[in-house]
A protein has these predicted regions:
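Binding-site signature for planar aromatic cofactors or substrates
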Residues: 1-140
Length: 140
């Protein structure tokens, strides 16, 4: 289950997107997305440049939502979501390469301004996967 061990949280956890987390998202090729389903974690992914083309700000990340039916069902039951991204192009604390987990609350929006923005950039999208960032944990 997501966040089932809060005592294990990284001491370097920060609120919203700090400069390192933002740089990581700006350079990540692929982002893994985890939601909690009734039978355990559900893992999907998206291309990092898709979020960059729609929108990343200090509090929110937006991906185009194609299918994501199970992701949407999971988020309706439990809005917690985690993103994992990594890039060797970002300097880590111990050498080349940085990775991190972004924790937040998510929803799939099929209507509204954010869905329209996603559909304008990606005509195949049925809406937007919107992540409200709560905190980031850098790894590596």
């Amino acid at each position: 289950m997501l966040d089932s061990f809060p005592e294990r949280r990284n001491r370097n956890a920060m609120t919203a997107l700090d400069p390192t987390a933002r740089e990581l998202l700006e350079r990540a090729e692929f982002v893994a997305i985890v939601t909690q389903g009734p039978d355990g974690p559900h893992l999907v992914g998206n291309w990092g440049d898709y979020a960059r083309r729609i929108g990343i700000d200090d509090e929110r990340i937006i991906f185009p939502a194609g299918h994501y039916e199970r992701t949407e069902q999971n988020l309706k039951r439990d809005s917690r979501i985690q993103l994992m991204a990594a890039s060797r192009a970002v300097r880590g604390s111990r050498g080349p390469g940085q990775g991190g987990v972004i924790h937040g609350r998510g929803s799939v929006q099929a209507e509204g301004e954010l869905a329209s923005r996603a559909k304008a950039v990606f005509p195949w999208a049925r809406g937007a996967l919107v992540i409200e960032v709560e905190r980031c944990e850098m790894q590596l």
